[in-house]
Amino acid sequence: MAAAVALACAALGTMAFASLAAAAPPEIGRCVALEKTLGEGEKKPHYHGAYGNNCTKPNANHHGKYEWMPGPGPANHFFAISDEPEPVLETVGGQKIECSIMSWEGEYTGAKSLTIKKFFLQGCTSNGKGCQQNPAKEGEIEVTEIEGELGGLKGPKGLEAAWVLKKSGTWQTFACGTTENPTIEQLEGSVIGVVTKGEGFGDVNRMSRESFINFKQTHGKQEPESFEGMPANVLSTMEIKFPPATTTEQTGLSALVESASGLGKPIEEEQNREKLEIRTKPVA
């Protein structure tokens, strides 16, 4: 990979790479180590990258050892899981759906986008009774084809990155309670989770196979509810009880998600894994 990037640098020149990296942060991509190349009029090989280590500090002379490549590489898959603390959906009215595990798998589709192919909630209960879409799979809720968009937030130390997850139409309709007296729940809307460094292993401004996303809510109110200057992205739950009575309430999600990138199949093979970086620092 390093050799390929070095050859591309020599062929296209630094202006091509500067335009490639022109997207405003935050964005997901790869900080790639270069090889020395011989530039026009030079007597000995030099590095010709736009950045230093982690691609967060521009090199004004374009003699940096690294180049930024927006978006994922060929190993663009990911698998994510949340189990500690256990994920919770809570309405502003205090109704909770508590699950033991939340997991998803999908693909990064660009420098600011992803698609979750399958999203699972398992071990879900409300007031001690199971919540599920299929009576044969107690406690399980599955959602497909969720879109993710990377956006920016103003944090105490500068720009922060966050994912908004959204789906056209209903996320899922499921039942909580007993078979004889169920409550029908319908989850809709969108939700924002902030990208964090985790315990120092995350991919914020550094290359890593791990990414951490914190979905935080208090009493059904998501924190945050929107990107800077943008409309709110919040979830809502429509609850249908019998005899007929329907209520709709804003809903918050709390979960700390650990996502591993580049996990193709079989996942244990090194060629199916790739480090990525979510960069929040200014571009060159």
Located regions from the model:
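Sec/Tat signal peptide C-region and signal peptidase I cleavage site
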Residues: 17-23
